[in-house]
């Protein structure tokens, strides 16, 4: 339940709980594939005149690839959500605030879920393991499976220094 009717606040804070499918249109353009549902829980409460504060959390699994060897990797993603929904447009200077129309009768929590998920998804790639060796730059073999047999690359910029080192040993 991520659409909350404002009349529900007559009974006090509103508990929110939802499970959104990974292919929900809300997550289009996210830049990551969701490998499971997005589970959202939280508590929405009135925080003054025409202001509502939502504190919650989300968790899901993102399917991505290792940035070194390109193996498929599943990464658990968890995030806390703190959002202020307000009809007072002077309070919108806070980056965690969301505007409500003055005539609004419900609060849509989905934009806050999307934004927090977008911020929580790893942007710079992940590793399949901390010591991932990646791919051979010559043949493309996965070096985690063992050596590829390619000759080590020689950096010709260091040949003069290697020759000098050889002369000093003699």
For every predicted segment, state its role.
Residues 1-170:
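Structured interface patches
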């Amino acid at each position: 339940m991520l659409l909350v009717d404002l009349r529900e606040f007559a009974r006090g804070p509103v508990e929110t709980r939802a499970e959104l499918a990974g292919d929900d249109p809300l997550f289009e353009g996210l830049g990551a594939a969701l490998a499971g549902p997005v589970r959202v829980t939280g508590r929405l409460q009135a925080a003054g005149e025409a202001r509502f504060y939502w504190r919650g959390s989300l968790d899901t699994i993102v399917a991505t690839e290792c940035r070194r060897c390109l193996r498929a990797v599943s990464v658990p993603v968890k995030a806390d959500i703190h959002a202020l929904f307000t009809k007072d447009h002077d309070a919108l200077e806070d980056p965690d605030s969301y505007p409500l129309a003055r005539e609004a009768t419900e609060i849509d929590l989905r934009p806050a879920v999307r934004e927090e998920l977008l911020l929580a998804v790893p942007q710079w790639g992940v590793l399949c393991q901390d010591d991932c060796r990646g791919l051979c730059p010559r043949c493309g073999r996965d070096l985690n499976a063992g050596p590829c047999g390619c000759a080590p690359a020689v950096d010709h910029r260091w040949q003069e220094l290697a020759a000098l080192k050889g002369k000093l040993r003699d």
